[in-house]
């Protein structure tokens, strides 16, 4: 599990595609301080398993489904990537629950500088938009962010200068593709309501109840 608080911006050293999957090597330092083979590191929000490492880089396999569902297949040498180690049991929970399992991608439609922040509008599919709500959590390239507002096909987030400095968002442009992970809580609630057995005793839990409770 991750929290969406980026620890380091690494750089792609090499990405080697082998048929339907790829092997990616990433230059990094901080996330390698206590790494072990088999550990997981989120790369632009994608949970990858470390298959080899040295003092300044690590390698991971990227499966075909991951290449299809995420933007990792578009990365090139020297592309900056957001990195976060899996959360330790005694770590601080600084963002929100992030699984590292990407739901899909979005496209940056607008970048609007403001006085003390920068507004990003992200356009994505209706399949993802159904889980994106005003003031809810969203993970963009592994970064835990709060949704400011939405419309039928896009949503906006406001990024403070510190986040732009400490992540790869400063390198993004209009048209850039980003990985999106919806808040896992909403997905579980939907499945709970849809798959409730017919013979189960009636519960007071409903969408209206959750809305009234502030969810």
UniProtKB/Swiss-Prot annotation:
Molecular function via GO: riboflavin synthase activity
Gene Ontology BP annotations: riboflavin biosynthetic process
PROSITE patterns: LUMAZINE_BIND (PS51177)
Top EC class of this enzyme: transferase
Binding positions for 2,4-dihydroxypteridine 2 per the UniProt entry: 47-49, 61-66, 100-102, 135
Lumazine-binding repeat start-end pairs: 1-96, 97-193
Entry-linked InterPro entries: ATP_synth_asu-like_sf, Lumazine-bd, Lumazine-bd_dom, Riboflavin_synthase-like_b-brl
Catalytic activity reported: 2 6,7-dimethyl-8-(1-D-ribityl)lumazine + H(+) = 5-amino-6-(D-ribitylamino)uracil + riboflavin
Record pathway: Cofactor biosynthesis; riboflavin biosynthesis; riboflavin from 2-hydroxy-3-oxobutyl phosphate and 5-amino-6-(D-ribitylamino)uracil: step 2/2
Enzyme Commission code: 2.5.1.9
Keywords from the UniProt entry: Repeat, Riboflavin biosynthesis, Transferase
Coiled-coil region list: none
Residues the entry annotates as binding 2,4-dihydroxypteridine 1: 4-6, 144-146, 158-163
Subunit annotation: Homotrimer.
Described function: Catalyzes the dismutation of two molecules of 6,7-dimethyl-8-ribityllumazine, resulting in the formation of riboflavin and 5-amino-6-(D-ribitylamino)uracil.
Protein's UniProt name: Riboflavin synthase
Originating organism: Actinobacillus pleuropneumoniae
Gene for this chain: ribE
């Amino acid at each position: 599990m991750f929290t969406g608080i980026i620890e380091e911006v690494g750089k792609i050293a090499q990405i080697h595609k082998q048929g339907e999957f790829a092997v990616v090597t990433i230059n990094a330092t901080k996330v390698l301080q206590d790494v072990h083979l088999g550990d997981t590191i989120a790369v632009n929000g994608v949970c990858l398993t470390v298959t080899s490492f040295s003092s300044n880089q690590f390698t991971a396999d990227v499966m075909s489904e991951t290449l299809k569902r995420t933007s990792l297949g578009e990365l090139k040498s020297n592309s900056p990537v957001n990195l976060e180690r899996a959360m330790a049991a005694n770590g601080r929970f600084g963002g929100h629950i992030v699984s590292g399992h990407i739901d899909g991608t979005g496209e940056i439609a607008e970048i609007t500088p403001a006085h003390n922040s920068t507004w990003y509008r992200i356009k994505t599919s209706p399949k993802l938009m159904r889980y994106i709500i005003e003031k809810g959590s969203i993970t963009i390239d592994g970064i835990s962010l709060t949704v400011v507002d939405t419309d039928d096909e896009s949503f906006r987030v406001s990024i403070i200068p510190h986040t732009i400095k400490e992540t790869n968002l400063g390198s993004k442009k209009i048209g850039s593709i980003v990985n999106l992970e919806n808040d896992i809580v909403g997905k579980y609630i939907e499945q709970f309501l849809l798959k409730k057995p017919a013979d189960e005793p009636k519960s007071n839990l409903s969408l209206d109840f959750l809305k009234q409770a502030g969810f």
